[in-house]
């Protein structure tokens, strides 16, 4: 039986707002994948949001896979520990205690058929799908990513009217909400204040949340979807 698992790592709003990602930067640190079924990953679809509503000029990026179960009969090793951090997101790898947690990797290569992203037909995001993989999965699964060039998630969608915690309405300005956001997006402002989950986008200046706004965010604060990169993993029993 074939299974599909959606993976939604978080890249905090303040990290996205700070600067574009550069070659060899950590895109996101270890994210535990819940609900994965199967003993190996056979295929991966990657969905990458654009820069302020416009699709990215895509670059290569590398996915790393790991497990907390470090077990080797040869050396008599049996340790259960989640993979330690790679380092600071939006900077290079700087810590290295994850070495024995690794189980595999995959490189999305913009120059290779079957590994590269679409050419911008979707306007606001880029997508790539690859298959024929056999990345082993241990007792659990973690995923992290390193970019091989510039990826930019910076936004100029700004709070137009100070948000209020007694309403689901969010008014924005400067850049269109229809281009940048969609139902299901989780919004934070540039200082990582939680705004809420988008229920609908009425027009370029009006967003409706699933629940009342979680925080009071000031006028002119930039808003971010904290899940600009998502993956769908395919596997078989």
Q: Which ranges hold each PLM region?
A:
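C-terminal interaction-tip segments
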Residues: 1-18, 132-157, 224-237
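Viral structural modules
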Residues: 1-33, 183-191, 197-198, 208-211, ...
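Extracellular and analogous surface-interaction loops
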Residues: 27-38, 129-135, 174-177
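Beta-rich globular "head" domains
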Residues: 27-67, 181-186
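Short, flexible beta-strand-to-coil junctions
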Residues: 46-52, 59, 67-74, 144-153, ...
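Surface-exposed turn/loop modules enriched in turn-prone residues
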Residues: 49-105
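Extended, solvent-exposed segments with strong compositional bias
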Residues: 85-133
């Amino acid at each position: 039986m074939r299974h599909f698992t959606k993976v939604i790592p978080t890249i905090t709003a303040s990290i996205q707002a700070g600067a574009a990602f550069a070659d060899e930067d950590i895109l996101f640190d270890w994210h535990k994948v819940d609900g994965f079924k199967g003993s190996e990953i056979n295929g991966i679809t990657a969905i990458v949001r654009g820069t302020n509503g416009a699709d990215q000029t895509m670059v290569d990026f590398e996915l790393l896979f790991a497990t907390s179960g470090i077990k080797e009969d040869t050396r008599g090793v049996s340790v259960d520990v989640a993979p330690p951090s790679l380092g600071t997101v939006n900077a290079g790898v700087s810590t290295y205690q994850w070495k024995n947690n690794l189980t595999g990797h995959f490189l999305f290569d913009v120059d290779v058929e079957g590994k590269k992203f679409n050419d911008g037909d979707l306007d606001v995001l880029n997508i790539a799908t690859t298959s024929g993989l056999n990345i082993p999965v241990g007792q659990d699964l973690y995923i992290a990513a390193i970019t091989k060039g510039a990826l930019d998630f910076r936004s100029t969608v700004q709070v137009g009217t100070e948000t209020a915690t007694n309403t689901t309405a969010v008014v924005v300005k400067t850049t269109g909400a229809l281009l940048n956001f969609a139902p299901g997006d989780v919004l934070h402002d540039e200082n990582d204040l939680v705004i809420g989950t988008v229920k609908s986008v009425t027009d370029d200046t009006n967003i409706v949340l699933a629940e009342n706004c979680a925080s009071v965010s000031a006028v002119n604060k930039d808003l971010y979807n904290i899940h600009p990169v998502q993956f769908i993993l395919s596997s078989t029993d």
